[in-house]
């Protein structure tokens, strides 16, 4: 039990470190926001149900952060990392339940973080980053439905909501 608690603490230290590093480094080193983030901000000022290239959620979330933080570049890097950390958290939970081993769950998350799309490209908030947490959430809650003896309405509802938001994040989400 104590080992599991330590692994959970290590996971949260890892997640917090990831958040700080991947928010701080681009904030310090980049002179401009990435182009996809600028495009999302432009679209966010005039929200519609879709744009000529992408669905609306990649513009909606930056617009929410713009309304909260204003024109602060660091906030959009933070937004990207929040989306990545939600993915990490649900992959960690999913792996813990499927593998029934907290250590293997943590290793799964570390391996996921080594994938290019979960580190070097994440400072640029775009449709690819926007869909990440929804993939993890849909898989996790689908697993809960599959693994449970009695299907809970809330799990079904959450799968539907997260799948819908995921589809509105990137149309290729439908392949899930």
List the predicted regions and their residue ranges.
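Short helix- or helix-capping micro-motifs
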Residues: 15, 105-116, 163, 167
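Start-transfer (signal-anchor) and selected internal transmembrane alpha helices
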Residues: 1-22
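Short acidic/glycine- and proline-prone juxtamembrane loop motifs at membrane-interface regions
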Residues: 120-131
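Transmembrane alpha-helices of multi-pass, membrane-embedded glycan-processing enzymes
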Residues: 62-66, 77-90, 115, 131-134
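Membrane-interface transmembrane helices that cradle and orient dolichyl/undecaprenyl
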Residues: 96-99, 138-155
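Membrane-interface alpha helices of multi-pass inner-membrane proteins
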Residues: 46, 154-171
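Extracytoplasmic catalytic/substrate-binding loops of multi-pass membrane glycan-assembly enzymes
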Residues: 25-40, 50-64, 70-75
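Transmembrane-helix signature of polytopic, membrane-embedded enzymes
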Residues: 9, 91-114, 132-133
């Amino acid at each position: 039990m104590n080992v599991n608690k330590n692994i959970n603490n290590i996971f949260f230290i890892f997640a917090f470190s990831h958040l700080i590093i991947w928010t701080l480094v681009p904030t310090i080193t980049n002179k401009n926001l990435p182009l996809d983030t600028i495009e999302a901000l432009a679209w966010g000022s005039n929200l519609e149900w879709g744009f000529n290239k992408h669905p609306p959620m990649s513009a909606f979330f930056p617009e929410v952060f713009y309304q909260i933080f204003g024109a602060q570049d660091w906030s959009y890097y933070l937004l990207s990392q929040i989306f990545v950390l939600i993915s990490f958290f649900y992959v960690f939970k999913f792996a813990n339940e499927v593998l029934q081993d907290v250590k293997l769950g943590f290793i799964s998350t570390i391996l996921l973080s080594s994938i290019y799309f979960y580190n070097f490209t994440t400072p640029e908030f775009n449709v690819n980053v926007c869909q990440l947490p929804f993939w993890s959430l849909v898989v996790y809650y689908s697993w809960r439905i599959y693994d449970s003896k009695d299907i809970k309405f809330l799990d079904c509802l959450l799968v539907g909501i997260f799948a819908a938001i995921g589809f509105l994040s990137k149309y290729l989400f439908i392949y899930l």
